Amino acid sequence: MTGAAGAPTDAAVGGATTPAVGGERNVPVPDPFARDYILLGIRLDQHIPGLVDGYFGPADLKAQVDMEQLRAPSRLAEDAEALVARLPREVADAQRRDWLAAQLVALRTHASTLAGDRLPYIDEITHSFAWTPIRRDDAIFDAAAAEIDALLPGSGPLADRLAAWDARFEVAVDRLPTVIDWLVGRFRSTASVLFGLPNGEDLRVSLVTDRPWSGYNAYDGGLRSRVDINTDLPIRAADLVDTVAHETYPGHHLEHAWKEADLVGRQGRLESSLILLNTPECLISEGLAVLGVEFATPPDEEVDLLVEVYERAGMAIASDRGAAREGAERTVAMTMPRRRLAESRVNAALIRHSDGASHDQTLAYLQRVGQYPPQLAEKILEFIEQPLSRTYVFVYHEGEVLVRRWLEVVPAGERPGRFGRLLHEQLTPTAVAAEIAAASAALPAAGAAPARAAAAPPSRPGGG
């Protein structure tokens, strides 16, 4: 399965270039600060495998780290501190400086944790993402469940009825390639009109198993992505639509491709060639990816899109046009309450890692409050318990809340342009929250709730 065809292009920027990883293209030579930031991230990845989610920058920096002696975590924490001290005199652009500062707080936190300076779970999240999550009141989930209950046919336990409803709209694995290719093409066309596409971008999609996530974007550089869709559990049509938009257009693939073309290629900000998990950039990236489907498919087209997915997937319900449309309408009506219900994952992570609940207690919470069937609850908890994703679980829900508020403080007609900024700029959660506050103050009638950025972290994680 593939998206758009086209050959990758070298970075079009004046000045010296150097071979990128993979050896098929060049990138600008990084300035000293970006070089040392990249080295720090790659060195940390040797201690925390998977921290580097993607790297498409200079090949010699990766080779340097591969050949050198493993650097102690305490030394890496000192390296991060030294970079923070250098920021004011070496990085002139305010947005770039703020972005690097937030990233460095996270990297310093990870290094200090490795060195034995562990933080409480909430503090670890705050230092990692420049954002403090909040525990949801279970009444929110009860209200969402009541909305879903009213929309579902039949009687009996809600979890059973919801599982039975979802089973009617599962896409058979052998039909996934056809449906995914069609969705990718459709969403790419929409994204091209709204946001433009870098010349030569492309992606390919594969089906995988035995993963803790539903979908994953591996960005290779050269404007190329590999997208994996996990088939461990049945995939319902509406979830497939969300996942494809999230991972491709206008989600992760388009974000990474534009940032490579613009930030790295045109502006020479080589730090953006290193994609790091558990850093503030993830909160923004996941927020835009979650909301991407709302730009990929306008609200007035959602029902028609689902009906066509049912047809292309060869679902039995597609043979009855009226039943298919009714099913799509109910599914769309359940979208927002189901999203609210999914925020029970935030509480589950807090219960597990902050409150000290057992695996079984957390599993029971997900099934009771989140209305998840046992197999899906186990898969969610597997993700929550993974060392690398134990804090990452928050970025989907918190990122969506933050980015949605940021979009909604401007008129609807301005939101595609505003969303486009997320594809091109180095924005931090703190900067986005500040823009929300400024817009809300200027337009109090908009009624936007205040955003909740983290307070400025102490000079040393865990310090006073």
Segments the model singles out, each with a brief description of its role:
Residues 1-2:
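N-terminal export leaders
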Residues 19-464:
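N-terminal maturation segment of proteins
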